[in-house]
Design a protein with these regions (language model features):
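C-terminal motif of bacterial Sec signal peptides marking the signal peptidase cleavage site
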Residues: 20-22
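N-terminal substrate-binding region of glycoside hydrolase catalytic domains
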Residues: 37-139, 288-291, 319-320
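Conserved, mostly hydrophobic/aromatic
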Residues: 81, 157, 242-244, 318
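Glycoside hydrolase catalytic-domain groove-lining segments
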Residues: 95-112, 240-292
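Substrate-binding cleft of extracellular glycoside hydrolase catalytic domains
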Residues: 96-212, 335, 365-369
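Aromatic-lined carbohydrate-recognition surfaces of secreted/lumenal glycan-active proteins
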Residues: 160, 197-229, 278-291, 319-323
Length: 371
């Protein structure tokens, strides 16, 4: 394992001067030490590329070898590496995040209030939102926050993603759903989620973990597709969100229909843009399976990598979900970029565009404000 951070293009202007005289320009750029207090800059032009790389059942078996192998396959360093931290493990993934940061990538952590056996469609478990709101898990939250603070480097954290679906135990359908609350003029399911989200963020910030940027991460379309369950109902407010995130999946199972990128992104993207006029948007998960009789995966990937940067200008990062699994009917869902030669070639070609940034842009933070 490397002992020094390997940021290939992390030199960014912390103090740049630009003078123009006729056709002459002079730019002075000061080097940024990634081991010092820094923050990740949202790119004005282009977008970061990233991946989740099939890190095991609990999505946390991060290794440098897996990251480097993936980068060799796709032909570009990854600016963002995603992994999970399930509450059932009751720990903070310090070792994983060190591997990612020392490799020169930004950790994206899905912090999920989920207990073993980590199966979907089972309903709430011991980490239910009501207990979180009541403070039952404050000791764990505080310890996690302390470890995040002590990690000391930037990371993005998602608390309870895809809450507008019906598959995770924190989904709004389990917490009152469409029951109307006259006092708040809102629905009980989303209100309970927002209360839990704010409680968690407040406690983490209260422990001094200012190196965390928070992402509000929804599924592109809501299930059920009812007004009460639309993403805006769950939005905890601009003070609690730094990034807006979307999951965008094409066909994952053999009996699902094929769908192109505009049909998956157009309306959800506009919905996110209306939530906040300025916050950056991330395609926090995107992938499709290899189903040649349904549609061409290579063309789907090509379309995604083109349109994310041209049709949707507020998208500033996209994280591919590189995973393969076997279903109960013995069929496979192969979302990996190299599920076929055509798929891999499309991904490599799209990622080769310089607008897809494989290296982080960093800005130094004065030590007085980095505490």
């Amino acid at each position: 394992m490397r002992t020094d951070a390997v940021f290939a293009v992390v030199v960014v202007a912390i103090a740049s001067s630009l003078t123009l005289a006729g056709c002459h320009k002079r730019i002075s750029v000061q080097h940024v030490d990634p081991n010092g207090p820094v923050e990740v800059v949202i790119p004005e032009h282009g977008a970061y590329t990233g991946a989740f790389i099939d890190f095991g059942e609990e999505e946390e078996d991060v290794t440098l070898e897996m990251i480097e192998d993936f980068e060799t396959i796709v032909g570009k360093h990854q600016a963002i590496i995603a992994s999970s931290s399930y509450w059932g493990e009751q720990d903070f993934p310090t070792a994983n995040l060190k591997v990612i940061w020392l490799h020169g990538s930004l950790p994206l952590v899905f912090w999920s209030p989920w207990d073993r056996p980590y199966e979907q469609n089972r309903g709430p478990d011991k980490f239910n939102l009501n207990d979180i709101i009541a403070g039952k898990w404050d000791v764990y939250i505080d310890k996690w926050a302390d470890a995040a603070r002590d990690f000391g480097h930037p990371l993005i954290v998602v608390f309870a993603n895809e809450m507008n679906g019906d598959w995770f135990p924190w989904s709004g359908i389990y917490y009152g759903g469409d029951e109307w609350i006259p006092q708040s003029r809102s629905w009980k399911g989303p209100e309970n989620f927002k209360a839990a989200y704010r409680h968690v963020v407040d406690r983490v910030r209260g422990r001094g973990a200012t190196n965390i940027k928070w992402m509000f991460h929804t599924n592109n379309y809501s299930y059920p597709l009812d007004t009460w369950n639309f993403a805006p109902s769950y939005y905890p407010g601009p003070d609690y969100v730094d990034w807006l995130g979307l999951s965008v999946y094409g066909q994952q199972f053999k009996d699902e229909p094929w769908a192109n990128i505009p049909s998956l992104v157009d309306w959800p993207y506009e919905e996110m843009c209306r939530l906040d006029p300025k916050k950056p948007i991330m395609i926090a998960e995107w992938a499709t399976g290899e189903f040649p009789h349904s549609g061409p995966k290579g063309e789907w990937i090509k379309q995604g990598l083109e349109l994310f940067r041209t049709r949707y200008p507020r998208i500033k990062a996209a994280v591919y979900w590189h995973e393969r699994w076997q279903n109960p009917d013995q069929s496979y869902s192969n979302l990996r970029v190299n599920s076929s030669v055509e798929s891999l070639n499309a991904y490599r070609a799209g990622l080769a565009n310089p607008a897809w940034l494989g290296n982080l842009i960093l800005r130094a933070i004065p030590r007085s404000t980095a505490k």
